[in-house]
UniProtKB/Swiss-Prot annotation:
Subcellular localization, as worded in the UniProt entry: Cytoplasm; Membrane
Keywords recorded for this protein, A-Z: ATP-binding, Coiled coil, Cytoplasm, Hypersensitive response, Leucine-rich repeat, Membrane, Nucleotide-binding, Plant defense, Repeat
Gene3D superfamilies: Helical domain of apoptotic protease-activating factors (1.10.8.430), P-loop containing nucleotide triphosphate hydrolases (3.40.50.300), Ribonuclease Inhibitor (3.80.10.10), Winged helix-like DNA-binding domain superfamily/Winged helix DNA-binding domain (1.10.10.10)
Keyword Coiled coil: yes
Domain NB-ARC per the UniProt entry, residue ranges: 539-826
Originating gene: R1A
Protein name (Swiss-Prot/TrEMBL): Late blight resistance protein R1-A
InterPro entries in the cross-refs: Apaf_helical (IPR042197), Disease_R_plants (IPR044974), LRR_dom_sf (IPR032675), NB-ARC (IPR002182), P-loop_NTPase (IPR027417), R1A-like_N (IPR021929), RX-like_CC (IPR038005), WH-like_DNA-bd_sf (IPR036388)
Binding residues annotated for ATP, in chain numbering: G572, M573, P574, G575, L576, G577, K578, T579
Topology within the bilayer: Peripheral membrane protein
Species whose genome carries this gene: Solanum demissum (Wild potato)
Length: 1293
């Protein structure tokens, strides 16, 4: 109805006018809504006045009555009284808009009374008609076309919806009492509308063939409209209950189909049956439209014979399943079944409407009686409906599956199948045989999946990956069907059919594999190259290649030039290497040694001002001195004061807008000491805006020589390319369009291939000329050649924010929880995942930003912006991952009806998660990232609480990963999400519910507290020890306790590897806990004891323990000596130790590589003696804020030490001279120590560099007091060191 749009515009104009005059009251708004409601119904009736059938419906009688009432009010009678009332109401709307104040009644009460009395007189002459059209009365009217009928029904439904939604008793549109009957009428009208739509869409003959049906539908809708308009709302009736009962009676006539035909043999059902039979005869030629009009199958089952109650209940359940799944199914998934679908829908309609016409129904009517009366076999007629429902349900589920999968999903399923059958034996008993067959089939396919991972370059790679994808998709289906069975969401007959289909499809997949002999060949052949691709650990060569002239020019600007502050701006397109070039200059020893302070930050498109300041402060003054709880402006002032007296070098990377520079420039004071700022950006305008003295540098493209040099370096490292490959290599380098990022990505492809001319020629041919200046094409090619087990891992980077460093331990835990990692006998999943990551690093798809000094493993990484954008876009295309950003993504409703439910969702806003929750039933993971401040203060925290999440999480029933670590504070743990494997969040409560054991799949549990909160105790329930799959229990901000009496009778957690932070008040408790966790690898705990119990003088930690952190709670003495044969990392905090204790500890820790002593006291003598041979494998020694005065170290101690860090050791006399002779030493850092420590550090460097020619040695001195002068020195160059040592030693002396 076009008039509805006119009314909407009219209403908006009135509201705008009243708001301009003065604030529109709620009463005025309600009056406007009331008149709009009346106008919409009147408009509907106006459209019906000219119908030839109107006289039979009583319409004209009512119109005549309205004319009489007009005369009574001395108003000239209009030709059409409905039009008259429409005009009157429009005038009243104008009156309200002029005087919107509720106190200015302006005769409204009088008009309301007139309208109500008018309706009363109408009702006195009007009764709900008991007749339908006779068979021989068919009216050929243009307005009975299906489009008009559907619009008319939509208008009536819209007005009824208004009444249902209003719950305010003071509203003029409020309907008292239960509204179930109105809602049921709404359902009936929607059904009728679906029916009209279905007939219209499927009809291939002229529409007038079904005029009887369309006219009947219009009559029913018009009478419902008349009943509602005349009787509701009941604002003018004192006896509202009586009016409500009268309306209920009238609506019941419609509901119970008491509209009888003039001719006894014609009924509403006859009309429906006739039109369905006509459609059935033309189905083969019907239009191929979406079958979503299957809403017609939502037929009510009231008023049916008692004998059909059970059969009809089953039928109704089937039809609901069909409808619910059809509306979420794309037409492409049914393109070969549309005719069958139409046939089933029509048959269902025929079946139901036939059942209404059976005469003489009795209480004891049997199924045989019904079949005889209907003339067909009811159960047999239902079978095609079952078959179609089964097909549609499977298609509806399959269309939501991602096209990229983790090959570890079968491992997860096989474990769960066993657990499910044990936990839910009653629910799954009837499926026992099918589940055993499925389990056996999946187990038989495990060797094949192993081959897919270990032989990614197999000649049958495409076939293998296609089969692997099909296998994983079947695993998803089995999981869904089993869950649906347990929760009784799908009927038993459907589940049985579905599992049988799955078994048949798995058999077909196996036959396909066996046909190509892939399984037999790989099982019988000794694989020479097994998992070499997983085990290798390539290192990224950080040495920059090319741009020699640019680097030299920029180096001069940094070291020479103006005495004032200068900004060196570098701009250019993505992928040119701006960040790599800037980092190369920033870390150039000839550059940074000339500056007192060096600091850097990365901005990116979405940034946090506070985060930027914090990053700069951490570099400028050290992590320990940064006060994160301060406001951003206070931190900025701290940074400015820190830089003020120094010569500084600042790197500001990836600036997108001028406003960023406006925010930061005030932090960088100019005191004419040649301080420099390097700024990179994609935009020339930003570079020009930030420039001070030097002109912005537009970074050029590579030339052909540089392109080949970079390609050769990335593929061959320090080796040279063979002459046979050089020609094709030069051609490939040229194809990369002189873009460094493209060259690096192509090098990643070549490095994975055999060094043969044929292979390289194939790459050159596949790349083609189209890749010039198109880095996306290169990324796509790099992605295409990835083995399938790495594709999911790579795309998962799309869940992270741009320009953010990614913690690799967290990334690997997420990969494992997402089932991306395929298990391999005898290997830890973490080790396999590290191999996957190193493979991606070796392909130049992932950049390492930090590696562990002790073992060289990557600790942090990031992606180039171009690669990250690719991951987000491709992941969305593959139904794999969708990044939900408030500024970029439309409302979830659009996604619901495009039928894409992605496997993984990444959010930046809590409200986005709430909005999308109802649309994400199949989602497997939710990651909520924080794009603003990384650190929260008490001023920020109130906006971060969102306990509404507890109400929406049950919608994510298949959730396996829920990572809320970076944004949300919750007051609950979602114990109903039984599939959950990874859960991370901030909490404020001091206990964990015992129901946490419901999360029997949970492998990683990370709970943190607000940074502003004081450290408190968190009680662990004994049921935690029932969670046998738990691998990482990380609760760092609490003192976690569990009663020893409860622990004694609990099970062992054999899979637990990480435990933090547990509190022990007795050594006995610690010993008991260690027995219950025999495979721990990382333990962080607090201890509180007074003395050594003799029986616990040596506490034996688990043999696999590698990381141990011990914190003092109250008493300073450690009540045990540590014995951990494979311990590599030890941190002791707050204890009082002596040389004997540390000597005994060293004897038990032969493999220790990292030792950190923090705020440790050394007794009355404040002395530490380290004897010969102690700490033989130690690589890193950090001493922080110790009370140590005298440190004596034997010549043969610390023989493999590489790093020595002293921080805040103000009383230490000196660093022992034996460190001069440790040839493995590479680094000494001295922060906030006295002058004697600095002097000894300088002497050590002088000996290391000059005497032993240790060119890798590096000394960093930060913030020590020397004649009231603050210093930060970063010395590595021999000449710089020589001059600095001479000058500083001279001052010290």
């Amino acid at each position: 109805m076009n008039f509805n749009n006119e009314l909407s515009d009219l209403k908006n104009r009135f509201l705008f006018r009243t708001l301009r005059a003065q604030k529109c009251s709620d009463v005025a708004r309600d009056r406007i809504d009331f008149f709009i409601w009346e106008l919409k119904f009147l408009n509907c009736f106006l459209h019906l006045q000219s119908f030839a059938f109107a006289s039979e419906c009583g319409m004209l009688d009512i119109s005549q009555k309205m004319i009489e009432i007009c005369k009574r009010f001395n108003t000239p009678p209009p030709h059409n009284s409905f039009a008259y009332w429409k005009e009157v109401i429009c005038k009243r709307l104008c009156a309200i808009s002029i005087q919107p104040d509720a106190s200015s009644d302006d005769g409204f009460a009088c008009w309301k009374k007139v309208i109500w009395k008018t309706k009363q007189e109408f009702r006195a002459k009007y009764s709900f008609p008991k007749t339908l059209l006779a068979d021989n009365k068919v009216y050929d009217d243009d307005d009975t076309n299906p489009k008009f009928v559907m619009e008319f029904i939509d208008a009536v439904v819209g007005n009824l919806n208004v009444l249902v939604k209003i719950n305010d008793p003071s509203s003029l549109l409020f309907v008292p009492g239960p509204k179930e009957q109105i809602e049921q009428v709404l359902k009936e009208l929607k059904l009728l509308r679906f029916f009209v739509c279905f007939v219209s869409n499927k009809c291939i003959e002229p529409q007038y063939q079904h005029t009887t049906f369309y006219t009947h539908a219009l009559i029913e809708a018009s009478h419902i409209a008349m009943v509602v308009w005349l009787n509701l709302p009941i604002y003018g009736n004192r006896n509202q209950d009586l009016a409500s009962s009268e309306v209920s009676c009238l609506l019941s006539d419609f509901m119970e189909m008491k509209i009888k035909s003039i001719q006894p043999d014609i009924s509403r059902n006859n009309i429906y049956i006739d039109v369905l039979r006509a459609l059935k005869s033309t189905i083969p030629q019907a239009q191929d439209k979406h079958a979503a009009e299957s809403g017609i199958v939502e037929t009510p089952t009231h008023n049916l014979m008692v004998g059909l109650s059970d059969q009809m209940a089953n039928l109704q359940e089937m039809l609901c399943l069909l409808r619910d799944n059809l509306i979420h199914l794309p037409i492409l998934d049914l393109e070969f079944h549309l005719q069958d679908m139409d046939s089933v829908i029509v048959d269902a309609g025929l079946l139901i409407y036939s059942l209404y016409d059976i005469k003489g129904q009795k209480e004891d009517t049997t199924l045989e009686d019904i079949n005889q009366a209907l003339g067909f076999d009811l159960p047999r007629n239902i079978e095609p409906i079952k078959a179609m429902i089964n097909l549609v349900m499977q298609k509806a589920f399959q269309c939501n599956l991602p096209r990229i999968h983790g090959l570890g999903y079968v491992d997860f399923l096989l474990k769960n199948l066993k657990d499910f059958q044990g936990r839910y034996s009653d629910s799954l008993d009837f499926l026992k045989n099918q589940l055993q067959v499925i389990q056996t089939e999946f187990e038989s396919l495990q060797p094949f999946l192993k081959v897919v991972v270990e032989e990614p370059h197999n000649k049958l790679k495409t076939l293998n990956e296609d089969c692997a994808t099909q296998i994983i998709r079947k695993a998803y289906e089995v999981e869904y069907v089993v869950d649906a069975c347990i929760n009784k969401e799908v009927p038993q007959w459907c589940i049985e059919r579905w599992l049988l289909d799955i078994i048949e499809e798995i058999t077909c997949i196996k036959a396909k594999i066996q046909e190509k002999n892939t399984v037999e060949d790989t099982m019988k052949t000794v694989i020479a190259r097994t998992s070499s691709k997983l085990a290798r650990t390539p290192r990224m060569n950080e040495e920059i290649v090319g741009f020699e002239d640019v680097i030299e020019n920029l180096r001069k600007k940094l070291l020479n030039g103006t005495k004032g502050q200068d900004v060196i701006s570098i701009h250019g397109m993505p992928g040119l290497g701006k960040t790599t070039l800037a980092n190369s200059l920033y870390s150039d020893r000839s550059v940074f040694s000339q500056f007192d302070i060096c600091a850097q930050c990365c901005v990116s498109q979405v940034y946090s001002y506070k985060d930027l300041i914090l990053a700069l402060l951490r570099d400028a003054i050290g992590e320990g001195s940064v006060r994160r709880e301060l406001h951003a402006n206070e931190l900025a002032d701290m940074l400015r004061k820190t830089l003020l007296p120094r010569r500084y070098l600042i790197l500001v990377d990836d600036v997108w807008e001028n406003s960023v520079w406006d925010d930061l420039r005030g932090c960088f004071p100019d005191v004419n000491n040649r301080s420099r700022i390097i700024l990179t950006t994609r935009h020339h305008e930003v570079a020009k805006y930030a420039s001070v003295h030097s002109d912005p540098l537009h970074l050029r493209m590579f030339d052909e020589v540089e392109s080949w040099k970079l390609l050769e370096k990335k593929v061959f490292g320090e080796e040279s390319c063979s002459p046979l490959l050089k020609n094709v290599g030069l051609r490939i380098a040229k194809m990369c369009g002189q873009l460094p990022l493209s060259i690096v990505l192509v090098a990643g492809i070549l490095s994975e291939m055999e060094k043969e001319v044929e292979c390289w020629e194939q790459v050159a041919n596949n790349l083609g000329s189209y890749i010039h200046n198109d880095s996306r094409a290169i990324v796509d090619k790099s992605y295409h050649v990835l083995p399938c087990h790495l594709k999911s891992c790579f795309l998962y980077f799309g869940a992270f924010l741009e320009d953010r460093v990614i913690d690799i331990s967290r990334l690997i835990r997420l990969w494992i929880s997402e089932a991306f990692i395929k298990s391999s006998e005898g290997r830890r999943l973490e080790d396999i995942a590290e191999g996957y990551l190193e493979n991606l690093i070796g392909r130049n798809l992932v950049m390492v930003t930090q590696r562990s000094i002790s073992d060289g493993k990557a600790k942090e990484c990031r992606l180039h912006d171009v690669l990250l954008d690719f991951c987000k876009e491709r992941a969305a295309e593959e139904n794999f991952l969708l990044w939900i950003n408030r500024d970029q993504i439309t409302k979830p409703s659009s996604c619901v009806y495009s039928h894409k439910q992605h496997a993984h969702l990444a959010f930046t806003e809590m409200h986005n998660l709430v909005e999308w929750s109802a649309s994400c039933s199949f989602v497997g993971s939710v990651v909520l990232s924080n794009k603003y401040d990384s650190y929260f203060s008490t001023r920020d925290i109130s906006s971060l609480h969102d306990f509404s999440i507890s109400r929406i999480l049950p919608n994510f029933k298949f959730l396996k990963v829920l990572d809320l670590e970076h944004r949300v504070f919750i007051d609950f743990i979602p114990t109903e999400l039984v599939y959950l494997k990874y859960f991370s969040a901030h909490i404020e409560q001091n206990s964990i519910p015992s129901s946490i054991s419901n999360l029997w799949n949970l492998e990683t549990l990370i709970l943190k507290s607000p940074i502003y909160a004081l450290r408190c105790t968190l009680l662990l329930p004994s049921t935690v020890w029932d969670m046998v799959k738990l691998r990482h229990l990380y609760i760092p901000d609490f003192s976690t306790r569990i009663e020893a009496a409860l622990l004694e009778n609990s099970a062992k957690l054999y899979n637990l590897e990480t435990l933090s932070t547990l509190y022990f008040s007795r050594v006995e408790d610690a010993e008991l806990m260690l027995r219950k966790t025999p495979n721990l690898r990382k333990l962080i705990c607090e201890v509180e004891c007074l003395e050594y119990p003799p029986q616990y003088h040596v506490l034996n930690f688990p043999i696999r323990l590698e990381i141990l952190k011990l914190y003092r709670s109250k008493f300073k003495t450690i009540p045990f000596c540590i014995s951990a044969p494979n311990l590599k990392y030890l941190k002791l905090c707050g204890f009082s130790l002596d040389s004997q204790y540390l000597s005994e500890t060293a004897d038990h820790l032969k493999h220790l590589e990292v030792l950190i002593l923090y705020k440790v006291e050394f007794g009355d003598h404040r002395e530490w003696k380290v004897s010969n041979g102690k700490f033989p494998q130690l690589k890193i020694l950090k001493l922080e804020y110790l009370s140590l005065v005298k440190w004596i170290v034997a010549d043969d101690a610390f023989p493999n030490l590489e790093q020595l860090v002293l921080r805040g050791c103000q009383d230490l006399m000196e660093i022992p001279s034996c460190f001069m002779d440790i040839l493995s030493l590479k680094y000494i850092g001295v922060e906030y120590c006295n002058e004697s420590v600095v002097k000894s550090a300088l002497n050590i460097q002088e000996t290391q560099v000059e005497d032993y020619q240790n060119t890798n040695f590096k000394l960093v001195l930060i913030e020590f007091s020397l004649q009231k002068k603050a210093w930060k020195l970063n010395l590595t160059d021999a000449e710089d060191m020589h001059n600095a040592v001479k000058n500083i030693l001279a001052e010290i002396r």
